[in-house]
Amino acid sequence: MAKYVLVDTLNMFMRAKHVGGARDIDMRIGMAMHIMFNSVKKVWRDFDADHVVFCLEGRSWRKDFYAPYKANRKVLADKRSVREQEDDEMFFEAYDDTIKFFADKTNTTVIQCPRAEADDLIAIWIQEHPDDQHVIVSTDSDFYQLMAPNVVQYNGTTDQIVSLDGFMDAKTNKRVVEKK
């Protein structure tokens, strides 16, 4: 039985992108990459994983059925200043380079589907590997519906593990919130 770390990659990147306090764009990008690499290393080590799978975003099929799906994100993006747009372009160039590094220079798996979000890919991976253990790395509460005896979620922002047993502090392994 293998233990997979399934990384909601864009979710992790966006969290890392907004952590750094530096004003210099190169320093902020460097800090975001540092946070991503160290986050994956921490989960790999703490959960004694066998393999890491980076799940990437594609265009959501949900937009074909429900036009307002995540439409507010475009509205917010359009309100950004020119500098913010330029910074985002640089961040996403670094993100693309990092994904290429993971795909070409490591033994990790990188998966993407043009018409599916990372959430969908993670759900399918778990479905296709029912006899293995899975650690989802994301802050997205949508993953709670995937919890099973062989599936947990690690939230690096709160340092909590979500499982069928509830929300546990990753350091103390004590319950922090009752299961809903």
Segments the model singles out, each with a brief description of its role:
Residues 162-180:
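Feature 3881 marks metal-assisted phosphotransfer/nuclease machinery
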Residues 2-137, 143-162:
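Noncatalytic, basic helical substrate-engagement surface that gates or grips nucleic-acid strands
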